Amino acid sequence: MRRIKNALSLAVITLALISCGGNKETEEHRESNDSIVPVVKDTTKITVNEETKFKFDFALANIPSPVGSINELSRWGIAYDNSLLNDTKKYKNYDTEFSKAINLGIYNIDMSYGMVNNKGEDVLRYMKTVMIESDALGLKGAVNQMVGKRAEQNLDNKDSLLKILDEIFVKSDSYLRTNARVYTASNVFTGSWVESLYLTCKMAGTVTDGSVKAKAYKHLWDQRFYLKNLTELLNEYKDKKECVELNDELKKIHSEIEPIKDPKDMDDAKFKLISDKIFALRTKLVK
């Protein structure tokens, strides 16, 4: 599939869900999957200029898909563990635009983790939660429901799922040029990046195989490049307190990785120190 070169491209899942939405929906509440979900309308003024859009495009183009990392993790021979995933019932706790967007990204990765491990029931459960969260952000749900139904019918066929995602990717192109939703997309992407690294570090911390550890350490070391791009993107939202606080934590993680000049210098102690910071941040985001 030409458009998906890194397995389940994060842009497909994230941006397709968002791009299908419009600004016409003003209902105070919407019903989704038999649950009444408050629609969050963020009224804080955000100025989004061409530079911000460029940084978003640049970050998306220069940060490997977090889902690609999950796909790589599935090839390391580490047993699937859905106890690490964010509880789908917790979506009701997320009552701000920021928390919903961040956790939409987190749920995207959890869904993808189940998908690359061929765990159909988990895929369906997380896909439904992704739909609820995207709907609660005021995004149009009709396409999501159509995709979800088709995905449910093809849970055992990874290629078919990828084709579905590839199809809706086409519809997300225009979204990248839509000023009003760049902030939301930035938060969704950040949530996905954090969750991907969280799962990688959690699972790598359980292995004793030296070759697998080396891969995990190299992966974490590589993040110093990508994390810099991500923090520069989030720097654009200085008028958003929650985003500033998140970015401060990301910068602390970057400051621990950046001085390490070679992946071979990443030992158990350093890996644990950085992993613990990632775990602490992730705990704040999903509470």
Regions found by a protein language model. Name each.
Residues 1-8:
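Bacterial N-terminal signal peptides that target proteins for export
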Residues 16-19:
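C-terminal motif of bacterial Sec signal peptides marking the signal peptidase cleavage site
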Residues 92, 96-99, 111-118, 122, ...:
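Non-transmembrane, amphipathic alpha-helical segments
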Residues 111-118, 137, 141, 176-179, ...:
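Secondary-structure edge/capping motif, primarily at the C-terminal ends of alpha-helices
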Residues 155-237:
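Extended amphipathic alpha-helical interaction segments
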